[in-house]
C-alpha cells in the first residue's frame, strides 16, 4: 500500500489522536498480572498493541472487548499465567516483546517468542542480560540477543540493583515487571531519565514504587490490584499532526486529550525553543485512570529558529525525531540532533533513512553516527520515497509531502497501522479533502 500526497495550503480544525501506544501496552500487561478486573478505555487498537492483547490471551488471560478501545481484562493474579501452547508472535512490536520477556522472567515455564523480519533484527540482549541475572533462562539467536527467543522464568526471581547502559524505558520496565515476583526489592538506575509510564501505572495498580532521585527507581514485590485505566492520546502520533500544522501556510490545528507526561514532552520543549506558535491547555480535573496528565495542544505556522536537540532531551522525544527532522528543514539556521544513536536500531535505521529519503525530496540532511545536522531554509520536492516499513518514517514523509512542490508517493505505507491507523483520515479531515490518497 502506498500514499499519494498532494500539497495543501490549508489545515484547519480539531482532532484527537489514538490512544498512547506505550500506556496501552502497559495497561494490558499489568491487567493480566493483577488480581481482579481491569477496565481499559482508549486502548490503542493498532497492530502493535493488539499483539500484546493476543499475547496475554495466549498466557491464559480472559480479555473481553466491550466497545471501540474498551477492554475488560480478567487478571490472572500471582502465579496465574499458563504456558502458551504455541509460539507467541510479537509482529513488529518491540515494546510487546521486551516487556513480555520481563513478565515471563517471573513465570516458571517456557515461552517461545518471535516477530517479523524487522523485529528479528532488533537488539534484545540489553533486556535479556539483567533478566538472566535475576534467574531467567533466555536462549536464542546471537547468544540470546535476537529473536526468536525461548524464555523460561522462575517463580521467585532474584532481587537486583541494575545500572542500565542507556536510558531505556523498555529495559527498565522489563526489570520492574520481573521484580513483581522477586525475593526482594529491585532497583534500576539510568544514565538519564526515561519515560515513566510503568512506574505511574504500577502505583495505580497498588505497587510500592519509590523514586529516590530522577535516575533511580525501586520496586517492592507484591501483588497488583485491577483498576480502571483511561489511556490518553499518544503525543508521538500527535507530533505528526502538530508538525503539519506548523508547516502548512494557512493552518490552525488543535489536538485534544493528548498525554503530556513530563517524560514524553521533549518535543513541546523543542517547539518552544524554535519559537513555534504553540498553545497548551491542561485537561480539566485531575489525571484520569492511571494518573497520566492530558492537555489540548494548538499550533499555527510562524517563522522557526533552529536549535540543538541532545542529552537528556533525547529519551523524551526519541520517537518524534522523524517529525522534528521534517520541521527542522524549514527553520532558520542549522538544527543539530546528537546523542540519538538509538535511532539506528528502531524499526529502521532512522538516521540513515531520514538522510536518504529527505534527500530524495531535495532536502539535505548531514548524517552523523549518533544523529544528524539539518540546514534550514530548504524546500521539499515531490518525489517517490520509501518508508522502509517504518510507521514513523511513513508519516514523516507524508507530512513533508503536504508542503512539497508536486506530488509525493510514500511506498510501503501500510505500516502506519502499527501506531496511527487513522492517520490518513485525520489529516484529510483537517485539509478538507483528499490530501492523502491510499493506493493498494
Name each region found by the language model:
Residues 1-440:
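Structural preference for solvent-exposed beta-strand-turn elements
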Amino acid at each position: 500500500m502506498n500514499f499519494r500526497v498532494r500539497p495543501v495550503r490549508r489545515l484547519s480544525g480539531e482532532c484527537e489522536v489514538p490512544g498512547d501506544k506505550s500506556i496501552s501496552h502497559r495497561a494490558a500487561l499489568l491487567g493480566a498480572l493483577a488480581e481482579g478486573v481491569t477496565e481499559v478505555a482508549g486502548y490503542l487498537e493498532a497492530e502493535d498493541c493488539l499483539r500484546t492483547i493476543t499475547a496475554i490471551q495466549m498466557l491464559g488471560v480472559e480479555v473481553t472487548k466491550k466497545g471501540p478501545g474498551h477492554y475488560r481484562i480478567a487478571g490472572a493474579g500471582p502465579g496465574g499465567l499458563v504456558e502458551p501452547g504455541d509460539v507467541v508472535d510479537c509482529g513488529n512490536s518491540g515494546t510487546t516483546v521486551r516487556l513480555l520477556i520481563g513478565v515471563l522472567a517471573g513465570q516458571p515455564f517456557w515461552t517461545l517468542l518471535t516477530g517479523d523480519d524487522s523485529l528479528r533484527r532488533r537488539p534484545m540482549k540489553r533486556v535479556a542480560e539483567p533478566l538472566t541475572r535475576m534467574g531467567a533462562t533466555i536462549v536464542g539467536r546471537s547468544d540470546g540477543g535476537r529473536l526468536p527467543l525461548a524464555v523460561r522464568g522462575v517463580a521467585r526471581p532474584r532481587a537486583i540493583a541494575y545500572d542500565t547502559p542507556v536510558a531505556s524505558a523498555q529495559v527498565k520496565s522489563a526489570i520492574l515487571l520481573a521484580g513483581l515476583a522477586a525475593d526482594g526489592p529491585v532497583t534500576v538506575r539510568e544514565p538519564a531519565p526515561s519515560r515513566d509510564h510503568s512506574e505511574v501505572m504500577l502505583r495505580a495498580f497498588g505497587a510500592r514504587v519509590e523514586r529516590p532521585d530522577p535516575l533511580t527507581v525501586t520496586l517492592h514485590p507484591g501483588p497488583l490490584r485491577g483498576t480502571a485505566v483511561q489511556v490518553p492520546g499518544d503525543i508521538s502520533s500527535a507530533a505528526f499532526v502538530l508538525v503539519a500544522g506548523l508547516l502548512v501556510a494557512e493552518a490552525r490545528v488543535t489536538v485534544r486529550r493528548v498525554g503530556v507526561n513530563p517524560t514524553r514532552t521533549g518535543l513541546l520543549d523543542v517547539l518552544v525553543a524554535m519559537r513555534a506558535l504553540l498553545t497548551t491547555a491542561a485537561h480539566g480535573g485531575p489525571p484520569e485512570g492511571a494518573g497520566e496528565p492530558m492537555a489540548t495542544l494548538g499550533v499555527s505556522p510562524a517563522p522557526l529558529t533552529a536549535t540543538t536537540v541532545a542529552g537528556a532531551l533525547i529519551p523524551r522525544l526519541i520517537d518524534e525525531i522523524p517529525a522534528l527532522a521534517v520541521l527542522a528543514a524549514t527553520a532558520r539556521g542549522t538544527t543539530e540532533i546528537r546523542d540519538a544513536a538509538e535511532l539506528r536500531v528502531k524499526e529502521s535505521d532512522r538516521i540513515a533513512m531520514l538522510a536518504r529519503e529527505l534527500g530524495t525530496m531535495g532536502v539535505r540532511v548531514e548524517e552523523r553516527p549518533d544523529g544528524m545536522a539539518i540546514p534550514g531554509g530548504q524546500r521539499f520536492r515531490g518525489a517517490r520515497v520509501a518508508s522502509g516499513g517504518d510507521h514513523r518514517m511513513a508519516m514523516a514523509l507524508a507530512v513533508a509531502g503536504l508542503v512539497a512542490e508536486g506530488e509525493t508517493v510514500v511506498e510501503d505505507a501500510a505500516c502506519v497501522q502499527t501506531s496511527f491507523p487513522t492517520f490518513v483520515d485525520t489529516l484529510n479531515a483537517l485539509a478538507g479533502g483528499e490530501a492523502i490518497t491510499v493506493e493498494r
